Amino acid sequence: MRILITNDDGINAPGLEVLEGIARDLAGPDGEVWTVAPAFEQSGVSHAISYTHPMMIAKLAPRRYAAEGSPADCVLAALYDVLQGARPDLVLSGVNRGNNSAENVLYSGTVGGALEAALQGLPAIALSQFLGPETEGLADPFEGARTHGARIVRLLLEKGLWDDGDYRLFYNVNFPPKPAAGVRGQRVAAQGFRRDTSFGVEPHMSPSGRRFLWIRGGAQHSPTLPGTDAAVNLDGYISITPMRADLTAHDRLAELEALIG
């Protein structure tokens, strides 16, 4: 099996090392693991692509590259340059430091990398480690993902739905904010919404007298509807959410057509 991995926390992020281990486990001794990840932090870039300027790329080691671009850029760089036309059997993005559940999905570069792979017709999974009070004291905050990651990916490869439509299905996986031994299993869950956690800005003044702003988010442990991704994570379960890039509100098309068509 040939596996391509990327992330949004950058080439030196600890979560990428976790994902490389997961990928090596999945690929086996005869497989290939290729890493093309951002040279710098790219959290919050979503599905951005850098088509207005060139993307520098450097080979760091055999099958390991750093690109000065977003996770989606890295997927494109791998498919159309690094791999020299060879197609990966699977694309994994992560393991993100922090959850990519609920509304975070819309901002996530980790999800954006998987989304781009899906648009390119490839099986893709985004993986993130929810952090919280129970992971703060751990020697390895990623131990949930490290312990259960390969099993979850195998489960999806063996039993998941992998349609090949125009907006191909991909998966968003979040590991709960628990030690590995405290993970209770996995749940298929819809994307939730935290009503009191939208982003805002926090104004400050620099020592030189210049005004600047920090973008801040809300509490990541706020509740979502029961059974949705963040809710099952907080209950100790790994959430598995099937996703597509199609943002159309299909359930409202007929109603809107009747009103204004």
From Swiss-Prot:
Residues the record lists as binding a divalent metal cation: D8, D9, S43, N96
Name of the featured protein: 5'-nucleotidase SurE
Location relative to the cell: Cytoplasm
Function summary: Nucleotidase that shows phosphatase activity on nucleoside 5'-monophosphates.
Domain of life where this protein originates: Bacteria
GO CC aspect terms: cytoplasm
InterPro entries with a match to the protein in the record: SurE, SurE-like_Pase/nucleotidase, SurE-like_sf
Family: Belongs to the SurE nucleotidase family.
Record key words, sorted: Cytoplasm, Hydrolase, Metal-binding, Nucleotide-binding
Cofactor note: Binds 1 divalent metal cation per subunit.
Alphabetized GO MF terms: 3'-nucleotidase activity; 5'-nucleotidase activity; exopolyphosphatase activity; metal ion binding; nucleotide binding
Enzyme Commission code(s) on record: 3.1.3.5
Reported cofactor(s): a divalent metal cation
Catalytic activity: a ribonucleoside 5'-phosphate + H2O = a ribonucleoside + phosphate
Keyword Hydrolase in annotation: yes
PANTHER family for this protein: 5'-NUCLEOTIDASE SURE (PTHR30457), 5'_3'-NUCLEOTIDASE SURE (PTHR30457:SF12)
